[in-house]
Amino acid sequence: MSTYAIIKTGGKQVKVEVGQAIYVEKLDVEAGAEVTFNEVVLVGGETTKVGTPVVEGATVVGTVEKQGKQKKVVSYKYKPKKGSHRKQGHRQPYTKVVINAINA
């Protein structure tokens, strides 16, 4: 059974395995840099370690592949019979990370 981990990043929890590419909320690092996630909630595989709230000494190491923005989301407000409307677009920034190692 392959080793996996659940990490906390950007206010979300993400299940990761070695070699997997994940998209997380924007991190302030350059593309090609190595990033370490210290908030590991669970490590699974042969045995499972559950943190209270995090697993002591466990880290997940990954490499930043690229920074980007998601597709545009358009919100539109409209007041009937008043001629009032407003259109606003938003593109959420993200970071693509490839997981290199899970250290339990």
From Swiss-Prot:
GO biological process terms on file: translation
Keywords on record: Ribonucleoprotein, Ribosomal protein, RNA-binding, rRNA-binding
Cellular component, GO, one term: ribosome
InterPro entries on file: bL21-like (IPR028909), bL21-like_sf (IPR036164), Ribosomal_bL21 (IPR001787), Ribosomal_bL21_CS (IPR018258)
ATP-binding recorded as keyword: no
Single Gene Ontology MF annotation: structural constituent of ribosome
Tree of life domain: Bacteria
Pfam families: Ribosomal_L21p
SUPFAM superfamilies: L21p-like
Subunit relationships: Part of the 50S ribosomal subunit. Contacts protein L20.
Function: This protein binds to 23S rRNA in the presence of protein L20.
UniProt record similarity statement: Belongs to the bacterial ribosomal protein bL21 family.
PANTHER family hit by this protein: 50S RIBOSOMAL PROTEIN L21 (PTHR21349), LARGE RIBOSOMAL SUBUNIT PROTEIN BL21M (PTHR21349:SF0)
Protein name, as recorded: Large ribosomal subunit protein bL21
Naturally occurring in which organism (per UniProt): Streptococcus agalactiae serotype V (strain ATCC BAA-611 / 2603 V/R)
Lineage: Bacteria, Bacillati, Bacillota, Bacilli, Lactobacillales
